[in-house]
From Swiss-Prot:
It holds the Pfam family TIM. Belongs to the triosephosphate isomerase family. CDD domains: TIM. Substrate binds at residues 9-11, 146, 181, 202-203. Gene3D superfamilies: Aldolase class I (3.20.20.70). One of its GO terms (cellular component) is cytoplasm. The keyword Isomerase applies. PROSITE patterns: TIM_2 (PS51440). Disulfide bonds: none annotated. Homotetramer; dimer of dimers. This is Triosephosphate isomerase. It catalyses: D-glyceraldehyde 3-phosphate = dihydroxyacetone phosphate. Involved in the gluconeogenesis. Catalyzes stereospecifically the conversion of dihydroxyacetone phosphate (DHAP) to D-glyceraldehyde-3-phosphate (G3P). It comes from Methanosarcina barkeri (strain Fusaro / DSM 804).
Amino acid sequence: MGLPFIVLNYKTYLQGTGQGAMEIAKACKAVSEESGVEIAVAPQLPDIYRVASEVALPVFSQHLDGIGAGSFTGHVFGKCIKEAGAVGTLINHSEKRLTLAEIEASLKAAKEFGLRSIICTNNVPTTAAAAVLGPDYVAIEPPELIGSGIPVSKADPEVVSGSVEAVAKINPRVKVLCGAGISKGEDLRAALDLGSQGVLLASGIVKATDPKAALEDLIRLI
């Protein structure tokens, strides 16, 4: 197994807003260059262009709507985020839930504009359903553990291993990420040992006093 893929979701944390978004992205780039680990960031929409323009690392959108050009006020258009510099998008995060039809439409839009896709799920059945759709990644995140500081890899390891097994049976080209409560090296190591190929995390890094040090701790056991 190669090095893991780490995706850092800024959410709307103050520490990851505006200039803070830039500083965290620079920390991610430094750690990525030092370690060889691919680290992507998902800043707020208005910060995508700035981060993508000034820091050479993968930038994801936190959301994408399954719409095209036209009368869709307030929606997130795939072509717009692609031209702003995004290379991928989260879909169906537990804080931005979508219906199955909306997930399919968002994934279709991501594929249309060449964006890497991460569909977030909350249990093994939803992971299996997401795998059928054929995204690049599914990220298993039980919502009750998000932001808790309690890693899913320890609190509910079966949901991770079960998701890995389900995806392998349905569509082995889809990669599995592990999320919810991930913040330390032990958490990432446990997630990888359960079969995931990376992690989706947020507060443990974004809200850290020293994000670079927190990232270095995260990868120290791989």
